[in-house]
């Protein structure tokens, strides 16, 4: 199913890439020369370790970590992986944006319109 979805997006939309939690979908999208963001929900240490191990086999263009309002964890992750990190989730104000960026995130993502206008 993931390969069908990626092919559909590539062939029938103007999408340049995908954001997904599924490593197999990242692999397929990369085969189709699409940009890829592999999203992780950092709930515990096991989720953190999954990022470290999967980055080498999946090769996403970016890794997005949620929640993004964890500068200490983002800093640690950015020193341990070579993939650019996007901080997302719970990014609600300038302080959380600056905290993530200062910690080493390449970018932040947010649905909060106030953050878009900073």
Q: Where would I find each of the regions flagged by the language model?
A:
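Glycine-rich beta-to-alpha transition loops that act as phosphate-gripper elements at the mouths
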Residues: 1, 19-23, 41-44, 67-69, ...
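N-terminal active-site wall of soluble small-molecule enzyme domains
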Residues: 1-15, 23-32, 44-54, 71-73
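Short beta-strand/loop segments at the ligand-binding rim of alpha/beta enzyme cores
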Residues: 14, 32-41, 78-88
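Conserved beta-strand positions in the central sheet of alpha/beta enzyme cores
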Residues: 19, 37-38, 64, 108-110
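Conserved, mostly hydrophobic/aromatic
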Residues: 22, 63, 100
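Catalytic-face loop-and-helix region of soluble metabolic enzyme cores
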Residues: 51, 61-86, 90-91
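Glycine-rich phosphate-binding active-site loops on the catalytic face of alpha/beta enzymes
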Residues: 67-70, 89-118
């Amino acid at each position: 199913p993931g390969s069908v979805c990626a092919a559909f997006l590539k062939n029938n939309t103007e999408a340049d890439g995908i954001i997904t939690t599924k490593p197999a979908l990242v692999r397929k999208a990369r085969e189709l020369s699409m940009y890829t963001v592999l999203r992780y929900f950092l709930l515990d240490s096991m989720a953190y370790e999954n990022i470290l191990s999967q980055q080498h086999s999946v090769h996403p263009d970016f890794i997005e970590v949620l929640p993004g309002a964890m500068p200490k964890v983002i800093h640690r992750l950015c020193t341990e992986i070579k993939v650019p990190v996007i901080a997302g989730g719970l990014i609600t104000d300038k302080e959380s944006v600056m905290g993530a960026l200062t910690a080493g995130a390449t970018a932040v993502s947010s649905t909060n319109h106030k953050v878009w206008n900073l």
